[in-house]
Curated annotation (Swiss-Prot):
PROSITE patterns: ZF_C2HC_C3H. It comes from Bos taurus. Pfam families: zf-C2HC_2. This is Zinc finger C2HC domain-containing protein 1B. Zn(2+) 2 binds at C121, C124, H136, C140. Its cofactor is Zn(2+). The lineage of its organism: Eukaryota, Metazoa, Chordata, Craniata, Vertebrata. The gene is ZC2HC1B. Keywords: Metal-binding, Repeat, Zinc, Zinc-finger. A zinc finger (C2HC/C3H-type) spans 14-43, 117-146. Residues 190-219 are annotated as: Disordered. Zn(2+) 1 binds at C18, C21, H33, C37.
Length: 219
């Protein structure tokens, strides 16, 4: 502000030019204006869109620029491998048909082909495309971690299960009520006090002697 040339206004007030925008202000006003003007001029402004300004207030919609799509990498065509697989499949089918007609055992099938674009799962050794492999490998990893067999852990688990079942359902001892016990005791006394009936010949109805009855039973 020291090198700026003052300018006399109509009211005999000295006006000093701004170093940034060139406008003239009084000394006290220039002190407030200077930092604000530098801040505004140093701030990066977005480029003015004249088309958007013209279309404002009209019914014409503004269409933004479509994002440029990245070119996808072109995969190599393995047509030769597909052609050889097709020929092998036809030859195998012809050999199977000929073996069926002649009554011979069927020849072994052709070996499976491996697609180089597929990703192999390190756990189950199966192959998937990129999208399916990203989902399957995580799932197969969790399943494989659950299948880890630990004999000590398995034995402890089985023992705890057996102990829990024994505590939940204890064996009940058979108890005989007083009424049932009295009935059994009366029947035993009746059987011991009842007289033995003599053996009777089924043909004549006559009583048989004890020794004769035993001998007839043996015969």
């Amino acid at each position: 502000m020291a090198g700026a040339q003052p300018f006399l206004a109509d009211g005999n007030q000295e006006l000093f030019p701004c170093e940034v925008c060139g406008r003239r202000f009084a000394a006290d006003v220039l002190e407030r204006h200077g930092p604000i003007c530098r801040k505004l001029f140093n701030k990066k402004r977005k480029p003015f869109n004249s088309l958007k300004q013209r279309l404002r207030g009209t019914d014409i919609p503004t269409v933004g620029k479509a994002p440029q799509s990245k070119p996808q990498p072109v995969r190599k065509s393995n047509w030769r491998q597909h052609h050889e697989d097709f020929i092998n499949a036809i030859q195998s089918a012809k050999q199977c048909t000929l073996a069926i007609k002649e009554g011979r055992p069927l020849p072994p099938p052709p070996p499976p082909t491996v697609n180089p674009d597929y990703i192999q799962c390190p756990y189950c050794k199966r192959r998937f495309n990129e999208t399916a492999a990203s989902r399957h490998i995580n799932f197969c990893k969790d399943q494989e971690s659950r299948r880890v067999f630990d004999p000590a852990q398995t034995a402890a688990r089985l023992a705890s299960r057996a102990q829990g079942r024994a505590q939940m359902s204890p064996k009940k001892e058979l108890t005989v009520t007083s009424a049932v016990g009295a009935l059994l005791q009366n029947r035993a006394l009746e059987a011991s006090a009842a007289p033995t009936r003599p053996a009777v010949d089924p043909a004549s109805g006559a009583k048989l002697r004890q020794g004769f009855a035993k001998s007839s039973k043996k015969d």
